[in-house]
Amino acid sequence: MIRHASPQDLPSILRVYEIARKFMAENGNPSQWGNTFPPEEMLKEDIEKQQLYVYTNENLIHGVFAFMPGNDPTYDYIENGSWRSAAPYSTIHRIASDGTERGVFTTCINYCKEQSPHLRIDTHENNEVMKHLIEKNGFIKCGTIYVEDGSSRIAFDYLK
């Protein structure tokens, strides 16, 4: 089940991100999230803005993601390609799972597809697992974007 995250969920959300960071580091991608991303304050803001969601099964949180309708300034500039549409879109950020259940990513993405016909997502070039999952779920690679710290990300979009 997908639902909005609540402040009471924060310990479980932090645990999911800790597991995801460890998995990323062990699978050739230690720098995308480092040891502390996303920071707790960012997650609290996402919860307050009602843009952080959790995937639960039997009331246990196994996945988490931010879903943000509207323009994301990170995607204003793209190089080595272009967006396939200038239509309004929603963005998926910080998607992660605890690795205990299969299909969490697809379930979260399908929820987002139900909310918006045009989605954007990005990941680090070394995040092979995420790149595979993104493309497997119907997203098309569009080019390279740069996040707040100046590092590059591979950007994808989905059009219904």
Describe the predicted segments one by one.
Residues R21-E41:
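Conserved GNAT-fold acetyl-CoA-binding loop/helix
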Residues A66-T100:
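Conserved acyl-donor/pantetheine-binding loop and adjacent beta-alpha core of acyl/acetyltransferases
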Residues K49-A66:
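Conserved beta-hairpin
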Residues M1-R15:
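A short beta-loop-alpha structural element at the N-terminal edge
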Residues S97-E114, H132-K136:
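Conserved acetyl-CoA-binding loop-helix of GNAT-fold acetyltransferases
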Residues E41-V54, N71-P73:
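A short helix-loop-beta-strand connector motif used in the catalytic cores of GNAT acetyltransferases and
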Residues T106, N126-G143, E148-S151:
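Conserved active-site alpha-helix within GNAT-family acetyltransferase domains
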Residues T91, E114-N126:
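Conserved GNAT acetyl-CoA-binding A-motif
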